[in-house]
Amino acid sequence: MARRRRHRGPRRPRPPGPTGAVPTAQSQVTSTPNSEPAVRSAPAAAPPPPPASGPPPSCSLLLRQWLHVPESASDDDDDDDWPDSPPPEPAPEARPTAAAPRPRSPPPGAGPGGGANPSHPPSRPFRLPPRLALRLRVTAEHLARLRLRRAGGEGAPEPPATPATPATPATPATPATPATPATPATPATPARVRFSPHVRVRHLVVWASAARLARRGSWARERADRARFRRRVAEAEAVIGPCLGPEARARALARGAGPANSV
């Protein structure tokens, strides 16, 4: 005989527990007489610590290979990667105090006892290039010479003689210009530039008409061109006009109708 199931109505919602208590898998619901059921929660388990480095374990293999997880902030500020960074400051306890003098390290060429160390050869003295050393020596001598000259000391060395420059060929004197006697104001040593006391003025000859037309403008130049064309046409007509008259034409026809020119 089949067992008949009893129909139940809709379930009533459970009243919420006190604030701060969340029912978990390990919580127990207890009820007291004439009171609402109370929820006693067991201490929640601490979440698993995140992995030290690398992607979370729930990532796929592709994300584990290509996902970039930044490291701690202390690794980003590592000064060893930068060659020009200053050396790190020592700890407070490692810093030398005023009472305790800082020990001096021996030079690289000295041994533990203060003598020469055969493993480290002595460093060679620094030498300037020959050209720079020569220039430095000349500059030092020049400064010393100036210092002695300003102090007015006796026995100051003479300044170095300037290299002799090739003498420029003197220009031949023109016969029209008479030779002037040397005046006391003129220095005995010839200079490169000479100023003659005699001044000659040379007048430049220019075409007045061209200069006048240039001052007037283009319209005046065109008018002058038209006038010149009319003048030349009139001169040509005066020469060719007599040859085109009726008498000249009759003479030309008479010469052409002679027996020598007959067909």
Swiss-Prot record:
Effect of V193E: Loss of interferon resistance
Listed Acidic residues bias regions: 73-83
Stretches the record annotates as Required for nucleolar localization: 1-16
Any one GO biological process: symbiont-mediated suppression of host autophagy
Effect of L134A: Complete loss of cytoplasmic localization
One Gene Ontology cellular component annotation held by this UniProt entry: virion component
Keyword Repeat annotated: yes
Superkingdom assignment: Viruses
Region (Disordered) location: 1-128, 149-190
Compositional bias of kind Polar residues: 24-35
Motif Bipartite nuclear localization signal: chain residues: 215-233
Region feature Important for interferon resistance, mapped onto this chain: 205-263
Domain notes: The triplet repeats region may play a role in modulating virus egress.
Cross-referenced PANTHER family: GH11727P (PTHR16489), PROTEIN PHOSPHATASE 1 REGULATORY SUBUNIT 15A (PTHR16489:SF14)
UniProt record similarity statement: Belongs to the PPP1R15 family.
Protein name as catalogued: Neurovirulence factor ICP34.5
Organism: Human herpesvirus 1 (strain F) (HHV-1)
Lineage, opening ranks: Viruses, Duplodnaviria, Heunggongvirae, Peploviricota, Herviviricetes
Gene: RL1
